[in-house]
Amino acid sequence: MERWPWPSGGAWLLVAARALLQLLRSDLRLGRPLLAALALLAALDWLCQRLLPPPAALVVLAGAGWIALSRLARPPRLPVATRAVLITGCDTGFGKETAKKLDAMGFTVLATVLDLNSPGALELRDLCSPRLKLLQMDLTKAEDISRVLEITKAHTASTGLWGLVNNAGLNIVVADVELSPVATFRKCMEVNFFGALELTKGLLPLLRHSRGRIVTVGSPAGDMPYPCLAAYGTSKAAIALLMDTFGCELLPWGIKVSIIKPGCFKTDAVTNVNLWEKRKQLLLANIPRELLQAYGEDYIEHVHGQFLNSLRMALPDLSPVVDAIIDALLAAQPRSRYYPGRGLGLMYFIHHYLPEGLRRCFLQNFFINHLLPRALRPGQHGPAPA
């Protein structure tokens, strides 16, 4: 088959023109996704030149390039204008960084913190504009939630409340379910589920009026049975189902609901080794003697060490999560789910499509590779395996 010198040149000119236009409009970012798309287009060009006649190669490559750039384009966003957003859990991590970014964009930000004198609260007070208002709130205290609701209604009387970001979260134990006090399950549910539920319900009249947004930070641990994270994971599973229900029920009111499910990021709450050491010592002090003998203190130390080792993979750059929250607040058509982080696509593929035995093996090797409890080790007297 006779080939043209460069039959796809017109397609590449079309792709380049559109890419340049999107870059000038800030609808496209220079980065790995764009470079990967261009590499795939180059490979497709090579195949088309060898397998298709020139007109067909031109059409296929132009169509593929157009689709790729459409997928990479930022979705249309709403103007910030005078929009107000309430964010919980702004002492550290995602909440603090999101509050700073939204304030810089021109939002009116109401940022709740556990302690108005915490380092994070002081940082927000120093770095942000007078538009940002700090509010003290403990999600386990109904009186704190009621006070924040009243302040929010008064503070947004002229602008309305556009968005609620349920970011505050808590995990206080990394241990097998049998070793975890029931109180830790209740505590996680109080913060991660009931507190968010009460606050969200209280703000619905304002959000219905603005036809605004509800954005909640969940976790993959609410979708997959991570070993030793049952207390945290069950609370995140509960809040995800609640938000999905809100998404259905509030659709007629024009409220859009999104859940952010980040991978492992280096936030203070996650990577504070001294805090996890204190929690481990508290756990050891409260385990009944007979149960501790069955599992062994070395088993608990091993789990603790494996958990801390897994945190080495935590990503220091929190911007993917912050960007996902902002997109959920401002995109004309936000997604119902966002998965910022590295490797989540593979994890969810394994969870949904591979056999149960392989899923369990993957989670244990990826997160915590268990040591056998003392009573089950060879040479130890203990219960016979079932």
Curated annotation (Swiss-Prot):
Pathway: Steroid metabolism
Active site, per annotation: Y232
InterPro entries, alphabetized: NAD(P)-bd_dom_sf, Sc_DH/Rdtase_CS, SDR_fam
Entry EC number(s): 1.1.1.-
ATP-binding found in the keyword field: no
Keywords for this protein: Endoplasmic reticulum, Lipid metabolism, Microsome, NAD, Oxidoreductase, Steroid metabolism
Catalysed conversion reaction: an 11beta-hydroxysteroid + NAD(+) = an 11-oxosteroid + NADH + H(+); corticosterone + NAD(+) = 11-dehydrocorticosterone + NADH + H(+); 11beta,17beta-dihydroxyandrost-4-ene-3-one + NAD(+) = 17beta-hydroxyandrost-4-ene-3,11-dione + NADH + H(+); 11beta-hydroxyandrost-4-ene-3,17-dione + NAD(+) = androst-4-ene-3,11,17-trione + NADH + H(+)
Record-linked Gene3D superfamilies: NAD(P)-binding Rossmann-like Domain (3.40.50.720)
Binding-site residues for substrate, renumbered to this chain: S219
Residues noted as binding NAD(+) in the record, renumbered to the chain: 82-111
Regulation: Inhibited by glycyrrhetinic acid. Induced by progesterone, through the Ihh signaling pathway.
Coarse class of the protein's main subcellular location: other
Function recorded in the entry: Catalyzes the conversion of biologically active 11beta-hydroxyglucocorticoids (11beta-hydroxysteroid) such as corticosterone, to inactive 11-ketoglucocorticoids (11-oxosteroid) such as 11-dehydrocorticosterone, in the presence of NAD(+). Functions as a dehydrogenase (oxidase), thereby decreasing the concentration of active glucocorticoids, thus protecting the nonselective mineralocorticoid receptor from occupation by glucocorticoids. Plays an important role in maintaining glucocorticoids balance during preimplantation and protects the fetus from excessive maternal corticosterone exposure.
Family classification: Belongs to the short-chain dehydrogenases/reductases (SDR) family.
Subunit structure comment from the entry: Interacts with ligand-free cytoplasmic NR3C2.
Protein name: 11-beta-hydroxysteroid dehydrogenase type 2
